[in-house]
Swiss-Prot record:
Reaction catalysed by this enzyme: GTP + H2O = GDP + phosphate + H(+)
Organism of provenance: Desulfotalea psychrophila (strain LSv54 / DSM 12343)
Membrane topology, as annotated: Peripheral membrane protein
Known EC number: 3.6.5.n1
Keywords linked to the UniProt accession: Cell inner membrane, Cell membrane, GTP-binding, Hydrolase, Membrane, Nucleotide-binding, Protein biosynthesis
Protein's recorded name: Elongation factor 4
UniProt similarity note: Belongs to the TRAFAC class translation factor GTPase superfamily. Classic translation factor GTPase family. LepA subfamily.
Domain of life according to the entry: Bacteria
Principal EC category: hydrolase
Amino acid sequence: MKNIRNFSIIAHIDHGKSTLADRMIQECGVITARDFQDQLLDNMDIERERGITIKSQTVCLPYTAKDGKEYILNLVDTPGHVDFSYEVSRALTSCEGALLIVDAAQGVEAQTLANLYLAMENDLEIIPVINKIDLPSAEPEKVALQIEEDLGLDADLIQLCSAKTGVGVHEILDSIVEHLPAPEGDAKAPLQALIFDANYDPFRGTIISVRLINGTVKAGDIIRFMSTGIEYKVEEVGLFKVQREARKTLSAGEVGYILAGIKTVQDTRPGETITLKANPCEAALAGFQEVQQVVFSSIYPIDTDDYEDLVVALEKLKLNDAALTFEKDSSVALGFGFRCGFLGLLHLEVVQERLEREFNISLILTVPSVKYIFTLSDGTTKEVDNPAHFPDPTHIDEVKEPFIKASILIPEKYMGAVMNLCMERRGENTTFHYPTPGRIEFICELPLAEVIYDFYDRLKSVTQGYGSFDYELIDYRKSDLVKLDILVNSEPVDALSQLVHRVNARKRGLHSCEMLKEEIPRQMFKIAIQAAIGGNVVARTNISAMRKDVTAKCYGGDISRKRKLLEKQKAGKKRMKTVGNVDIPQTAFLAVLKSEQ
């Protein structure tokens, strides 16, 4: 156990975590040059295409240090995006140390701080690494000063490297062996293993990733899940060496996987403790905080025959994505579907894309919303995240909406533009300070509903890509909320209803009407598209009718003949309008999701 090191790589988005992990794997000779590919640990196509890490991945690296001893380094590559910070917190519980990567050109950014605080909460030893020193714009001395002064980390531990070229990677591996502590635990004690992740394999069932705190486990053992008491027979144990590699036993201090023919998704909840039936441990390990969903949207299959497939797909996705929640939902316009909870808009996009790609289901999503708290006139409170469940306005005493504390790191020259953006989004209690010369940390309290829409894109736009953003939920505050209904041909479309602040209702209504006008095909009769709050129409647009030239066969002659034909056409269109249904194409629902620029 003295020769084991368990560590994570944490950083802001695009600071080079996955690239450094690739170089470490190459340096340790785990994979041949022929089998190597970039972003080796990012298994999903969507991760490779977007250049982001969504799912934490584990790999076991054998390494011979400069003292000549063989060490086992268990590396966990983590995501950098704020939506997936729960993946980071789960990965950190299985480690004793972390590499904190900072870009030599960008310096310390918002997510760098957030992930550092997560590591400190877990009492991890931290080795700062300044990456991308090969860039022409790199300023390693300046960034080293930032790390020492802003983060309070030891400057003597700072490692310089270029993950792209491989410079400095060997020194980082030596530093891990030298400065990170070995795991503590007793291999002879009763088994205590913490599940920190799980993946679904269609042939082998659930693959659980575990960190053994005490004891040993081998194939043939009967394991017990401590919270549920369910028991399974272990089929295989092993380590992650890019691919799974079976072993006879796993011992205290090691990070590996267990296969036990587990078919049900719910049993393998991350944070669960596993022990042996024959020699159980006395107490379960401290688990994880339940992750809080902040964005809610309804998902429906475009083809209603795909509903059963969607049920299966969500169940399987839930195993790989502990933060996803869903419950059954139905809509007059779209049929049966699910109301899902997500960690943010990127998480929502990723789930949608994975369902469409991996399970080949075409989907439609409703407008995202957050969870509001209503106090009703009879004194009861009601949590609402779906516009369909909006209480009767005459019974509402008070509405509260979630607020976040946003930390925005920007170059000084963009201060005015960012302040305007925050004020547009109903920002409050703005403060700022200078972490380093020329850079400002702008702290602002914002309604979450204003952030989930397109705040991150707008921030990147006004700061020309230099702004970074992190947030945490703080509390619920009183708000003036209304339900915005969209009516097509005087019929409300429930799937397009939105909960919005009264100040933004007209703007959002106009945007939705204009988007629908572009997407709904013209009919033989005029279609009115309206946005209404209760009985008051706040925005309206019309789709003009297609017109057949009924007077084409009239050559001159009496005007009354033309008028008679036009009146006859008008009466026919009026009759058509009263009985005609307007089919709203799927693209129209997606268009309403697009935020106003």
